[in-house]
Amino acid sequence: MYSSIMSLVFLLPIVAVVNLISNQSHFLMTLLSLEGITLSLVLFVPISLSIMSASNVSISVILLTFGACEASLGLSLMVLMSRSYGTDMLNSLTANKC
């Protein structure tokens, strides 16, 4: 039981990082990849604490709070960028607008 869950938890951040590397052009896909990494941390911490028989589960709540803050900041930046530049493409940020 634990081996299948742990393999899924170890596989999830790898898939999210590969998605982050392969989809660097769209801001929304970058945000989704970062949320996948945060989700894997939220899943990994309680599982590892239960394996080590630790009783402190407040760390996962703190990580979940930081994940929610990250999501709200990312979406507000995406709305600001799409209103300013008209697109969510990341290469529009680096283009020279002389």
UniProtKB/Swiss-Prot annotation:
One of its GO terms (molecular function) is NADH dehydrogenase (ubiquinone) activity. InterPro entries: NUOK/Mnh_C1-like. It is an enzyme of class 7 (translocase). The chain crosses the membrane at residues 1-21, 27-47, 61-81. It catalyses: a ubiquinone + NADH + 5 H(+)(in) = a ubiquinol + NAD(+) + 4 H(+)(out). Keywords: Electron transport, Membrane, Mitochondrion, NAD, Respiratory chain, Translocase, Transmembrane, Transmembrane helix, Transport, Ubiquinone. It is found in: Mitochondrion membrane. GO terms for cellular component: mitochondrial membrane. Its EC number is 7.1.1.2. It is a multi-pass membrane protein. Belongs to the complex I subunit 4L family. Core subunit of the mitochondrial membrane respiratory chain NADH dehydrogenase (Complex I) that is believed to belong to the minimal assembly required for catalysis. Complex I functions in the transfer of electrons from NADH to the respiratory chain. The immediate electron acceptor for the enzyme is believed to be ubiquinone. This is NADH-ubiquinone oxidoreductase chain 4L. It comes from Lumbricus terrestris (Common earthworm). The gene is ND4L.
